[in-house]
């Protein structure tokens, strides 16, 4: 191309006097890149960098403390906000709003204040200091954003706690002013939340990328053109009225699937089919206002297991048509997965600061009186702030009559109108709200209503519905709005059995006796009074067990400083229980120190004439009863887990004591060697002492049998002692092994101790000496070391009836009557009934002990008396206790619970028993308002007396925990408020939502979809609940039942199309696919119905994914998402096999089922029935044709097992399976262009000739070579 330098010189340069920001810079470089190539673009970028840094250096731009200027209007904004909050607080005290509505109003008020301050910051900097470094950096897009600037010079605002809940106390300070201690602590929540979120999301994002790569790794560009006529019609991606991605942004690098006609002259084409869309072509489309364009797409590409060049379009790296062999599946997976971490980076960069964008306010630009149109269709609702409002069912125009003229304002369907008919509205007043999203996600949430004061419950206008669940639990639910009043008073709850000494309406003074309670003994016994750390303990000794014939000693050298119990017959027991420790049934008190049952090695245990019973504490422990013997057949067992190569002896060898049988393993006794191995690993080495005798016949009937002295084992072998005979085989010869038996006698141990039992209830407790063993009859003890076969223990037993009895072990000194001195210490078990009294008692509760030390007490004898005194002066009102019917309770209405309001009797119409609320107009004078809420007790000529009360508003569906007339204390739970909470953006958007879409999960809160084309009719009842019916022209009718507080998106009488959402919530893609498939199945063949329904669902999934990424300002090209969605929507589920070889429940591709059914129909046989299925990326990866790829992803064992059983063949079409096998991957863009075939043939011929010459002639004969050549 020849450039005329004269023309360039003579061209007049443009001069633009405007600020160039980040977006403009991006646009400049993009235009230069596309028009002049990469070299010029790099040069321009370098020049811009030089200019930028040069002028930044000259200007000396840097942030200093002085640059952080706080708008002077901040204090005024905070003042207005505090006034609003005071109004909210008054509304709550008047019970006009619930605690939830108060919380939401408070949150929204602070959020609005924060937004107003943000606008003020922009205005302030723009007007007063446009060259401020902070302002320039943030608004040019160089560094920082508006949220961060707001925190620097505005206010941090509301913060989210670690659970995502909003902390109602906002941070009013900014970083310039500095935070106080409370604000700093609240601030730290958000900072930590940001760090935790980022780290968790990074891991989630990595796993999402792995799944995406796995599902799309075999998508490669394998051909130039699939010759399809199909395509997808593209338009703007919108959410309600808001355009998320404009059409022209989606077109670059795509190929047209159809001719684009000129709207004015249809016979003229703007662009023809299969044209690559460039920037110039987009300008033409904009010029002609083209709103819909049909494009080639990976979703409609007919290439098998790949995508063609034309359907994919241009590569995003260079703007040219994608190369053959490009692994576009991997690129798509990385393009979607990588921004995953950025989806929640917003939380990190704004430090967890909360922002809400659930509704968009509509403000008036003028003041006047609003007038409703006469034909207005609406229904009443209660807003989230507790205000009465209406929702407009059909769009209408409202008149606003100003002093000068009449203005009109049009409000759309679904708008919430906040002002009443004929009411005066101010300029910039919020008169209505519209939802920013058509499908807000709500979730059920609850909040406890807790009383702020003590008093008596009074229900006003509450209708309760009682429900009993399957477990018999009663639940009380309010059916409408109502009030729970707490009438103030001092509440007294008395324990069970307390007797009131006052009557109803008694006037009492402070310190008067109200009730008394007696604590009586439940058993007979001797009293004992002990002084503990901060209480008196009154013990009634019920019974004792003392060991008479044993004394206690302490030996610090032996038994870890434990006490020894020495009996008169020289037996030593070590005490296991602790002094003063509370004992339970079957606890071990002491254990005999004895080695009479100790073995040298392990072996086999056999019991003779002994009964075994499991102990209730431990299943592996047995109690031995009776007199008998334990026969123990010794054998040494080494349990090792090592390779068989370490063995130094063989199984069947006879080894002597201390022989090394394996490396580092020595035997303790002589005997026959038995080695147990598994997979050439030694598990056990067993040495069995005894004598081996060869025998001729099979003596398996004699094996594992005990023979006594004098018994004949076999011919010529008679035993003279107890032996154990075992049948064995040595080198295929039959033998018997006669093994020695050790005999242990088990005798009666009951006579070891002499127990002395005292007390009237002595049968409650007892001590017994018991023989215990850890081995059952016939058990093989696998051990090298010796074990104790029997443990003789002293056990404590108690009766089940002794539940309220405390039993402890005590050491008591025995008094020698002859010398009157204590010489010996005895062990005693004492059972007591214990009652405690604190030293430091409450002022109004006095307890006194009625018994003396050592006094004999009979059953039901009073031991403690407690007196309950009044803390206040006042009138007594006795009530029944709802929670514990046998307990008495009362309330005293003291002078502090009453207030007097001076007002003339003639000026009001109040009656005794009426309830008034704070702020109520009491008389004819409208300026005179009640300063208190309460119940009218008395009316005089000049004043009224009220009992102070607190009202609480409850909403329908509230779970009520209290009863009318019940007495409650401060902090008691009154009710559980149930409400619908809108999920915050962090929860419904971001990575979890992307994962939900790509894994094709059913959303929790789904919307209702139109089942067919028709008209929607919405019916409302008195409570504002809606019922929807859909009616078609074919007289079809479908009724939808809505969830509580589910919003309807369409107005009554509106025409809706099939699959259109008619209520709020997320779309269930599986339901949408089913609806469209059933509809198209009535219109066309199953294969066409499948393709058509897939096309609908694909567009919806594309829109949903783009909405999530765009909400976080992340741009992803449509074609990447289309590649992944193609993999998710390529299978059908077999329902009936027909005459095919397929099975019901099997997943096959659309291409496969189309070919199979075509072949079956051709031979007049029954085709298979199927339906389209939407697979999540994980399921799609596991159902791929390549079992090697699927097995390397998840469920390896199952996939490989199924592949082996079914005899599957992997054709190694994808990248992953080839990498695993170690083959060359079927991808890469280095393919040779085969356009000039003649030149390629000539080069190949010359190369072949040269190679032939080099191999044939190796002699240094240049002449000959030259001649030949």
Curated annotation (Swiss-Prot):
DNA-dependent RNA polymerase catalyzes the transcription of DNA into RNA using the four ribonucleoside triphosphates as substrates. Its EC number is 2.7.7.6. One of its GO terms (cellular component) is DNA-directed RNA polymerase complex. Zn(2+) binds at residues 226, 301, 308, 311. In plastids the minimal PEP RNA polymerase catalytic core is composed of four subunits: alpha, beta, beta', and beta''. When a (nuclear-encoded) sigma factor is associated with the core the holoenzyme is formed, which can initiate transcription. This is DNA-directed RNA polymerase subunit beta''. It comes from Cyanidium caldarium (Red alga). InterPro entries: DNA-dir_RpoC2_beta_pp, DNA-dir_RpoC_beta_prime, RNA_pol_Rpb1_3, RNA_pol_Rpb1_3_sf, RNA_pol_Rpb1_4, RNA_pol_Rpb1_5, Rpb1_funnel_sf.
């Amino acid at each position: 191309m020849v450039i005329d330098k004269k023309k360039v010189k003579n061209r007049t340069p443009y001069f633009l006097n405007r600020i160039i920001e980040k977006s403009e810079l991006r646009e400049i470089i993009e235009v230069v890149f596309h028009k002049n190539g990469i070299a010029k673009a790099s040069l321009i970028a370098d020049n811009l960098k030089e200019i930028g840094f040069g002028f930044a250096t000259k200007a000396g731009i840097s942030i200093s403390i002085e640059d952080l200027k706080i708008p002077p209007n901040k204090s005024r904004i905070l003042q207005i906000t505090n006034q609003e909050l005071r109004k909210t607080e008054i509304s709550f005290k008047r019970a006009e709003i619930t605690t939830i509505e108060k919380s939401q109003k408070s949150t929204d008020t602070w959020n609005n204040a924060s937004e107003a301050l943000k606008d003020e910051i922009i205005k302030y900097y723009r007007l007063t200091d446009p060259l401020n470094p902070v302002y320039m950096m943030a608004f040019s897009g160089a560094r920082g954003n508006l949220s961060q600037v707001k925190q620097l010079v505005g206010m941090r605002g509301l913060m989210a706690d670690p659970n995502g809940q909003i902390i109602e106390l906002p941070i009013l300070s900014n970083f310039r002013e500095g935070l106080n201690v409370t604000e700093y602590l609240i601030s730290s929540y958000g900072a930590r939340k940001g760090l935790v979120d980022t780290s968790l999301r990074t891991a989630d994002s990595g796993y999402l990328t792995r799944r995406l790569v796995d599902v799309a790794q075999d998508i490669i560009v394998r051909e130039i053109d699939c010759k399809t006529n199909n395509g997808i019609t593209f338009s703007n991606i919108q959410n309600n009225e808001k355009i998320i991605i404009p059409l022209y942004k989606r077109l670059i690098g795509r190929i047209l699937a159809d001719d684009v006609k000129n709207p004015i002259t249809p016979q003229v084409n703007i662009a023809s089919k299969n044209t690559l869309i460039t920037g110039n072509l987009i300008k033409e489309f904009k010029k002609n206002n083209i709103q819909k364009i049909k494009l080639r797409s990976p979703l409609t590409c007919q290439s098998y297991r790949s995508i063609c060049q034309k359907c994919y379009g241009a590569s995003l790296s260079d703007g040219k048509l994608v190369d053959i062999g490009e692994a576009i599946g991997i690129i798509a997976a990385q393009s979607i997965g990588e921004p995953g971490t950025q989806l929640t980076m917003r939380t990190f960069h704004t430090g967890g600061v909360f922002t809400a964008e659930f509704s968009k306010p509509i403000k008036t630009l003028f003041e006047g009186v609003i007038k409703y149109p006469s034909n207005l269709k609406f229904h009443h609702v209660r807003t989230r702030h507790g205000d009465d409002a209406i929702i407009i069912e059909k769009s209408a125009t409202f008149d606003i009559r100003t002093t000068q003229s009449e203005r009109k304002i049009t409000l759309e369907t679904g708008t919430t109108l906040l002002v009443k008919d004929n009411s005066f509205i101010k300029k910039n007043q919020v008169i209505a709200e519209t939802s920013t999203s058509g499908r807000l996600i709500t979730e059920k949430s609850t909040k406890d209503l807790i009383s702020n004061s003590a008093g008596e419950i009074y229900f006003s206008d509450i209708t309760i519905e009682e429900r009993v669940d399957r477990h018999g639990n009663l639940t009380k639910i309010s059916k409408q709005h109502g009030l729970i009043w707490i009438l103030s008073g001092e509440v007294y709850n008395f324990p069970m059995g307390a007797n009131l000494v006052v009557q109803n309406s008694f006037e009492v003074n402070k310190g008067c006796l109200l009730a008394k309670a007696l604590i009586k003994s439940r058993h007979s016994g001797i009293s004992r009074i002990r002084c503990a750390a901060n209480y008196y303990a009154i013990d009634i000794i019920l019974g004792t067990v003392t060991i008479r014939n044993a004394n206690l000693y302490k030996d610090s050298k032996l038994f870890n400083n434990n006490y020894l119990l020495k009996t008169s017959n020289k037996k030593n027991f070590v005490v296991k229980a602790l002094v003063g420790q509370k004992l339970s049934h079957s606890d071990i008190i002491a254990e005999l120190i004895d080695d009479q049952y100790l073995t040298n090695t392990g072996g086999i245990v056999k019991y003779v004439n002994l009964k075994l019973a499991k102990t209730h504490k431990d299943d592996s422990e047995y109690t031995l009863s009776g007199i008998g013997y334990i026969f123990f057949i010794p054998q040494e067992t080494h349990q090792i887990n090592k390779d068989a190569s370490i063995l130094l002896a063989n199984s069947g060898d006879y080894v002597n004591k201390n022989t090394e049988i394996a490396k580092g393993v020595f035997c303790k006794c002589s005997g026959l060697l038995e080695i147990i191995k598994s997979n050439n690993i030694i598990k056990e080495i067993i040495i069995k002492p005894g004598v081996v005798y060869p025998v001729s016949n099979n003596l398996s009937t004699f094996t594992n049998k005990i023979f006594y002295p004098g018994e004949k084992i076999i011919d010529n072998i008679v035993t003279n002692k107890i032996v154990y005979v075992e049948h064995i085989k040595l080198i295929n010869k039959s033998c018997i092994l006669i093994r020695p038996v050790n005999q242990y006698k088990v005798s009666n141990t009951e006579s070891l101790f002499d127990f002395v039992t005292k007390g009237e209830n002595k049968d409650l407790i007892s001590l017994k000496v018991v023989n215990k063993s850890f081995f059952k009859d016939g058990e093989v003890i696998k051990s090298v070391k010796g074990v104790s076969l029997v443990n003789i223990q002293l056990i404590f037993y108690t009766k089940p009836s002794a539940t309220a009895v405390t039993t402890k072990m005590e050491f008591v000194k025995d008094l020698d009557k002859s010398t009157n001195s204590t010489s010996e210490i005895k062990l005693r078990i004492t059972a007591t009934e214990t009652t405690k009294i604190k030293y430091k008692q409450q002022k109004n509760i006095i307890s006194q002990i009625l018994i003396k030390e050592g006094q004999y007490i009979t059953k039901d004898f009073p031991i403690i008396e407690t007196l309950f005194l009044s803390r206040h002066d006042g009138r007594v009102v006795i009530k029944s206790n709802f929670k514990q019917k046998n307990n008495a309770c009362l309330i005293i209405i003291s002078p502090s619970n009453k207030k007097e309001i001076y007002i003339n009797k003639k000026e009001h119409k109040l009656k005794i028993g009426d309830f008034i609320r704070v702020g109520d107009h009491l008389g004819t004078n409208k300026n005179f308002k009640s300063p208190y809420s309460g119940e009218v007790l008395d009316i005089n000529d000049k004043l009224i007396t009220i009992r102070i009360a607190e009202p609480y508003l409850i909403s329908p569906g509230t779970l009520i925990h209290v009863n009318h007339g019940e007495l409650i204390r401060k902090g008691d739970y009154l009710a559980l408020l149930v409400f619908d909470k809108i999920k915050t953006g962090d929860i419904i958007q971001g990575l979890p939502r992307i994962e939900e879409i790509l894994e094709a999960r059913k959303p929790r809160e789904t919307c209702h979809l139109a089942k067919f084309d028709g008209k929607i009719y919405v019916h409302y009842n008195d409570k504002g609940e809606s019922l929807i019916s859909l009616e078609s022209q074919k007289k079809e009718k479908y009724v939808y039942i809505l969830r509580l507080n589910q919003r309807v998106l369409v107005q009554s009488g509106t025409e809706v199309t099939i699959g259109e959402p008619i209520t709020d919530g997320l779309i269930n893609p599986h339901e949408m696919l089913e609806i469209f498939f059933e509809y198209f199945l009535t219109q066309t063949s199953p294969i066409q119905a499948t393709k058509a329904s897939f096309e609908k669902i694909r567009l919806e999934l594309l829109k949903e994914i783009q909405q999530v990424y765009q909400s976080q300002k992340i741009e992803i090209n449509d074609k990447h998402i289309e590649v992944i969605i193609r993999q998710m929507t390529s299978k059908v589920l077999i329902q009936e096999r027909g005459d095919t070889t397929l099975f019901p429940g099997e997943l096959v591709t659309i291409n496969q089922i189309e070919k199979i059914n075509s072949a079956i129909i051709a031979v007049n046989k029954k085709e298979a029935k199927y339906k389209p299925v939407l697979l999540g990326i994980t399921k799609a990866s596991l159902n791929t044709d390549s079992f090697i790829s699927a097995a390397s992803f998840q469920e390896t064992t199952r996939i490989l097992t199924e592949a082996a059983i079914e005899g599957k063949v992997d054709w190694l079409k994808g990248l992953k399976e080839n990498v695993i096998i170690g083959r060359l991957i079927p991808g890469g863009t280095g393919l040779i262009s085969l356009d000039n075939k003649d030149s390629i043939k000539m080069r190949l011929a010359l190369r072949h000739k040269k190679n032939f010459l080099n191999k044939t002639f190796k002699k240094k004969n240049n002449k000959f070579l030259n001649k030949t050549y």
